[in-house]
């Protein structure tokens, strides 16, 4: 089966069929328009999205009256950073930016993929954080550039 469009997301669709198969994906795979995946029931799918749209947790790839195939993002090893002041936020944002590390922001938290050097920096700067496994809503985007 070849999937070319995303039907919707389980958060916004009015109803779902009684049985759901899941395609477990790492967040890095959410940005790939063309890939081969296997559901938790062993069904092979080819994904070849016509639009340049990223996949997201809960996206419905296929559905009929009895079944749906849904994307489920695997939890990632993250540093969840909770600065307590604007100064702390500025310090850590500057340091993470200098390292060209992608970050995401959710409800007052900064999320970065686990890196022992960033963890050491957080400890040195006494910025509150915790390490945890968590699903992210979108892929971390690495934006490359060069310094001239």
UniProtKB/Swiss-Prot annotation:
Its main location: cytoplasm. Keywords: Chaperone, Cytoplasm, Nickel, Nickel insertion. Pfam families: UreE_C (PF05194), UreE_N (PF02814). One of its GO terms (cellular component) is cytoplasm. It is found in: Cytoplasm. GO terms for biological process: protein folding; protein-containing complex assembly; urea metabolic process. One of its GO terms (molecular function) is nickel cation binding. The keyword Magnesium does not apply. The keyword Cell membrane does not apply. Involved in urease metallocenter assembly. Binds nickel. Probably functions as a nickel donor during metallocenter assembly. Belongs to the UreE family. This is Urease accessory protein UreE. The gene is ureE.
